[in-house]
């Protein structure tokens, strides 16, 4: 049976088990949308407005940068939507690169994600929650690490016991994180000062010109818009993926675009632009200009940040283990990661082991900071994924349930915008980034050779 045979496609679409113990389709549109939005709206927005303002140089270019930054993500989501409906199974980039014809490249993408991105991200977010909690009450550093570990364990148990229960929580926490941001927007509109938009431009405009300043601002928004494609990790558990995936991917992009644009608009109107451009905590600083909040702004932002990051942490604990599950089902990862709990119908071992690795990184935070240099590899992986659709479309068995409109233009924009992020990441840390790429290849290829050989042996016996 081919990877995308008619019988298997029917099984994938309807959630029929193709073998023993498969994950079932239990997630509807609203749960999927909540996961996409909840993953994307994270701690980045609490600092990115200031970074974008500094790069853009004027209030209007700051707002425009968020608009364009969100719009250029739409082509990327269109590519993901088509690929996810062509291969409605768990695994995201790994699955798409594999079906594009490169199992080694697919394995390397999953290998790098597991060790250098997924588990470390759990520790980073858990520690960020504790850091914001420390703003409210002093916390001993060691105790803080145990609290962070406890958060990961709590979400492990939640998502291990029920995918529906985890999705319900994710929906609630996503609503909870949007409410305070909506309050900020409402207060910002009420206390908006138009004269802040008429303030003199910063030196960035005189040095580089408006167009280059706008490009710099757009680049600074890039990380704020990452996370929507997380739902592609769980496509195999989503009901009616042919309709749900495009709606959730593109819909989440539009929702986040509107939210971020309004936040950028009101924050730029609340405080003098020169102060915004030099602020490391722009939302907190902007709220101090609201008489109704004053000195309580910091507390409000700290609580909001904890809710926001809690939602992102929960989402990551939920979707990330599906990648290793997919690799294990292909006999290209540790077999235990492919285990499905007979009662809860979740990839229990994958959830537990990834959470355990995340807890390990909490107690070796110096190592976690070094893993940030693998960002270049992860960005390049995304570029390859967008390019994989070109090769997938050449396959005779490629029959997506939804196709990207204006395919050539959308694919070009998706690849180009991703390459811009690769370039900016390379400029940030060129040598460490290249070293990390070598590490991924040097460790990943032998690991792939081992599992590929073992997979062939298992196939020969079956």
Label for each model-derived stretch:
Residues 1-50, 54-60, 73-78, 89-90, ...:
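Membrane-interface "cap" regions at the ends of multi-pass membrane proteins
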Residues 19-23, 56-63, 78-107, 129, ...:
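Flexible loop linkers connecting adjacent transmembrane helices
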Residues 48-54, 74-152, 157-160, 306-326, ...:
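Hydrophobic transmembrane alpha-helices that form the core helical bundles
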Residues 336-345, 382-433, 454-462:
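C-terminal membrane-solvent junction of multi-pass transporters and transport-like membrane proteins
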